[in-house]
């Protein structure tokens, strides 16, 4: 169901050092940065990222966090976005569509739920 979990940080280098060590102890490779400065840790079963919030505000347990849900097709990404927006969610960031991530191409749609939690649907083309 989940594709990734992202948490916010106010000190990326301290977070990278911590997660490289803690996740490294579990056999996870060191984190890799993306173009937005987030540090990504990926396994065959999913990904974890840490980064400063994209809105420029201070990180907290909710600001800077994202919960990503897996979508089997690009059409499901769009359907997720449309259904969520119609049910009280708010479309955020770029419009739904293809992106280039640190591990290859993907299709994304981002929403905030009625409580303000940031979620997304993500499809990774084969």
Model-predicted regions and their roles:
Residues 40-45, 111-114, 124:
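Active-site beta-strand termini and strand-to-loop segments that position acidic
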Residues 1-16, 67, 125-126:
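N-terminal beta-strand motif that seeds the catalytic metal site of vicinal oxygen chelate
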């Amino acid at each position: 169901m989940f594709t990734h979990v992202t948490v916010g940080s106010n000190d990326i280098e301290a977070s990278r050092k911590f997660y490289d060590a803690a996740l490294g102890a579990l056999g996870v490779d060191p984190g890799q940065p993306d173009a937005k400065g987030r540090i990504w840790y990926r396994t065959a079963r999913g990904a974890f990222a840490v980064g400063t919030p994209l809105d420029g505000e201070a990180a907290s347990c909710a600001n800077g966090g994202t919960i990503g849900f897996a979508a089997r097709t690009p059409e499901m990404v769009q359907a997720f976005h449309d259904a969520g927006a119609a049910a009280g969610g708010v479309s955020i960031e770029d419009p739904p569509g293809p992106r280039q991530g640190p591990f290859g191409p993907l299709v994304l749609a981002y929403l905030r739920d009625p409580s303000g939690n940031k979620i997304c649907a993500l499809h990774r083309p084969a």
